[in-house]
């Protein structure tokens, strides 16, 4: 089974700050570093480090060579990673002393993905291959509909949540991975009623709900499972969700019991928040195993 991550790649400029800047405020940063990032790149690295057979499809600009190199170093297949005219997507990230972050995105080449390019990528994948998607690339509804017609298992992380999601038929989605805010946005109601909304409107849809400090909850027609977070010192939360997604998807692809999938995904996410940076913080599978032996 192949895992295709059709997704974004960004250059992350990370600024350490005393506190997240407020409107009209100017502050000095304590430090600045540049990392490879983007939800798509982070998730491809997490997928690969979790042991998945992952292909990354997407676009970079001529300034994105470092992103290509880090994916190659992590054994991600780059057959469908192409170079477009213009600049690579980038993010300006503030990280405060508690590890919380605030992110400003420039889409760049991520929003140059055409329907023709999407068609050329998807023609090489087939029924039951897994397609991982986020909402940081252009023509997402076309990609979803085309992949669904092929019978691919589509796992969608609707982040950042915006009006594009109105054009996505959730009946085409195998599994949604989302946090509480995204759950409220997609359902149009409170988080308390989300589970009933999902079961009443999309009974076959699997839901992976990440709940921050309250852990994670998996919801499907047949079962519900929960797992708490592992208590660690938080340094940087930037790649926590992407790390969780990568380990979760690989677990699904390997048909592991959901309790084991949640345990490994939670452990990987805990390790990710204990280090600075996005891609550099994503743990290898062996590190997750060692962590679980000690916790």
What is each model feature region?
Residues 56, 81-83, 93-130:
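Conserved phosphate-binding/catalytic loop of the ribokinase/pfkB sugar-kinase fold
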Residues 1-23:
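Positively charged, low-complexity intrinsically disordered leader regions
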